[in-house]
From Swiss-Prot:
The keyword Transferase applies. Its EC number is 2.5.1.58, 2.5.1.59. The gene is fntA. GO terms for cellular component: CAAX-protein geranylgeranyltransferase complex; cytoplasm; protein farnesyltransferase complex. This is Protein farnesyltransferase/geranylgeranyltransferase type-1 subunit alpha. Heterodimer of fntA and fntB (farnesyltransferase). Heterodimer of an alpha and a beta subunit. It is an enzyme of class 2 (transferase). Belongs to the protein prenyltransferase subunit alpha family. The keyword S-adenosyl-L-methionine does not apply. It comes from Dictyostelium discoideum. Catalyzes the transfer of a farnesyl or geranyl-geranyl moiety from farnesyl or geranyl-geranyl diphosphate to a cysteine at the fourth position from the C-terminus of several proteins having the C-terminal sequence Cys-aliphatic-aliphatic-X. The alpha subunit is thought to participate in a stable complex with the substrate. The beta subunit binds the peptide substrate.
Amino acid sequence: MSSSEEDDGYVPFSKRPEWSDVKPLAQDDGPHPICPILYSEVFKDKMNYFRAILKSKEKSLRVLDLLEEVIQENPSNYTIWYYRREVLKAIEQDETIEYDIQQEMNLLNDMGETDPKNYQIWNHRRFIVEKYIGSDNKEKEFLSGVLLEDAKNYHAWSHRQWLLKTYRDWNGELAMVDKLLSLDHRNNSVWNHRFFVISNLNPSPFPLSLIEREVEFAFNHIRHSPNNESPWSYLKGLFKGQKISTIYPSLLDILLEMKSKYIGCSHVNSIILDIYQEQNTKISLENSLNICKLLSETIDPIHKNYWNFKYNTISDQLKLIN
């Protein structure tokens, strides 16, 4: 062991009395390893004892302590986390062993702060919540704190949505979305979560009253930043399974007014194009073709191939009418 590791105060397991009955099991790389990994002596020591425990299948409190030390060395090691869950399940069945599961949550909270995008930590957290904690507002509070730090943490969003669908505690979700959008209205993760919430709280397809409310919500953000794609995508999603021209015909007039105001905005033109195509009349399809040309040649030439494809598709649609 290096002097620096000794100076850190690390005590090898071979010098810990409570581990004197365990013979460490070294990693076997074969007689002539081509490219052996240069693990630190501390890491090798911990893993050697973990291999021994894994072989003996011991499940006890001291194993939890060992696993915590190994996890600190390599938080992404799936096998360590898996065996930790097996130990926790075994301890639960043993009436002679007491273990406060809050200790597990404390470990996860601490590790989540230093490694917030580690999948294994979040996977283990879900296991603990589902098996031992259940519906607990503290979990939502914890997630709100994580998302305030990084509102694009996929694992945090995934865990929150699992929590909501499992325990059905939707209180305050839209308010939380509003708060995060006030901090960054371009965050597509937040828009996605809002859609997730309203989709779970309302029938599908959405009723007109909800659509009108959410369209106005999207417009409030669009007026602030018309080239922000997120609210436009959200707006289009509100009409999934329904025709805009049928359920909300007045929307076209609103969009045409916005089109004249937000010159060069591809998003408003794209939705107008879709509505015209839905109407499926000679005039509306001709208007669609004009928009396709405008988008491909002037407003959005980077997606020229797509708009040309749309142009050809609508041209074929127009031929069926003529």
